A protein has these predicted regions:
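N-terminal loops that bind phosphate or other acidic moieties
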Residues: 1-133, 137-377
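Single conserved hydrophobic/aromatic residue that forms the stacking wall/gate
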Residues: 378-399
């Protein structure tokens, strides 16, 4: 029996590989000789660097960069030497989790550190970039990142504008004289599932500004500044489009990537599934196991487990899902390729106990064991004509 396991991380508890290896442990208790492939999974958000880097046989590295508040932070990113690819999460350098609640103010938070990570990767030989841009603390339109890469964002006196959205208030000119020359040879794939525009009622300031600490007055100001920033950008890059879907992602970082770096915005799960070649592993599997920390109605909206299920169904494979929490509307997942799903919690516990990594690993392994015991039992008792999921799975295992 061959099982392919691709489970997204249980945020704050288990990484993708930890969750997958725990499920594999449970399966091996029942099928000691099973061939099990544990593959990394992420959707472009938290855990993408580790999942993609390890899934592509790369190495993790760490660099100290300027954090969102202007203070040094340590940022981990991945390098795949064979393809000269860097895998980056902007949240590692400019994420909202790096800013205490009492200090959240998008007028001053910067993406400068994101540019420093890119610059570091370029010096290490990378020319291809995969960047996840979720979880930002910023609303500077990517201005800080561009400054770190050599773009001149200048005020009327020719001085660099200050960090943060506040710098856009005094922005008068954008120059490209000192841009890193290597950038012309670089490609950028941006993992982004946000469709908001740069400005307007559905723009980054209005929609995401409040959670970053913006007041209503700040939102109006930042929206106006970003609009003028886009106008200046269009003078140099005619393709600049502040109305493009995703241009408002990460406080306008999406706009900066598309406009200044010719980046393409793509579904996060699409990038991960392609880069890790998951379909190559699933095509000759007998059963596929996926999951995430919380399985609910939103899972069907482009989340990682559904991406796995869709690939599995291309090859007519049965799909199981394990999750820390399962809501009533998770049944929507059954219509999108997940044949059956199971919560791994065995009793009512506190959130702290449920997320404890030791408990989570044990719960995952124990649940997987019991589910696969049922499958093994059905091998001896079920008729192949039965229409139950378990019999369907057994039938596939016997093929």
């Amino acid at each position: 029996m061959k099982a392919v396991i691709a489970i997204d991380s249980f945020k704050g508890s288990l990484s993708s590989f930890e969750a997958g290896n725990s499920a594999a442990e449970g399966i091996r208790r029942v099928y000691p000789d099973a061939q099990i492939e544990v593959r990394p999974l992420a959707d472009g958000g938290e855990g993408t660097v580790e999942a993609l880097t390890l899934g592509c046989a790369g190495q993790l590295t760490t660099v100290t960069v300027t954090g969102p508040l202007g203070k040094p932070v340590s940022c981990q990113y991945g390098i795949v030497d064979s393809t000269r690819t860097a895998i980056i999460e902007m949240s590692g350098a400019a994420g909202i989790t790096l800013v205490p609640d009492t200090e959240r103010n998008p007028l001053y938070t910067t993406t400068y550190g994101v540019g420093e990570v890119i610059r570091d990767a370029i010096t290490k030989g990378c020319r291809h970039f995969i960047v996840g841009i979720g979880g930002s603390a910023t609303n500077d339109g990517g201005a800080g990142m561009l400054q770190a890469l050599g773009f001149g964002l200048l005020d009327k006196n020719g001085n660099p504008v200050p960090f943060g959205a506040m710098g856009l208030e005094v922005l008068d000119k954008i120059t490209t004289d000192n841009v890193l020359p290597e950038l012309k040879d670089c490609t950028f794939r941006i993992a982004c599932d946000v469709t908001n525009t740069l400005c307007g009622e559905q723009g980054c300031s209005a929609i995401f500004g409040p959670q970053k600490g913006a007041t209503p007055a700040m939102i109006l100001q930042m929206d106006k500044w970003l609009a003028y920033y886009a106008t200046l950008a269009r003078e140099i890059f005619p393709h600049a489009n502040p109305k493009a879907a995703g241009s408002g992602a990460a406080g306008g970082l999406g706009f900066a990537f598309m406009t200044f770096l010719n980046g393409t915005l793509e579904s996060g799960i699409k990038i991960v599934l392609e880069e890790t070649r998951l379909s190559d592993y699933i095509k000759d599997a007998d059963i596929v196991v996926t999951g995430e920390g919380r399985l609910d109605g939103q899972t069907v909206m482009g989340k990682a487990p559904i991406g796995v299920a869709k690939i599995a169904k291309q090859f007519d494979k049965p799909v199981l899902a394990f999750s820390g929490c399962v809501t009533k509307d998770a049944t929507a997942c059954n219509r999108e390729g997940i044949d059956a799903f199971f919560p791994v919690l065995r009793n009512v516990v506190s959130l702290e106990d449920a997320m404890n990594p030791v408990n989570a690993r044990q719960n995952m392994a124990d649940t997987a064991e019991q589910v696969f015991r049922t499958i093994r039992s059905e091998e001896h008792t079920s008729e192949l004509q039965s229409h139950s999921f378990i019999s369907y799975a057994v039938f596939c295992l016997k093929k």
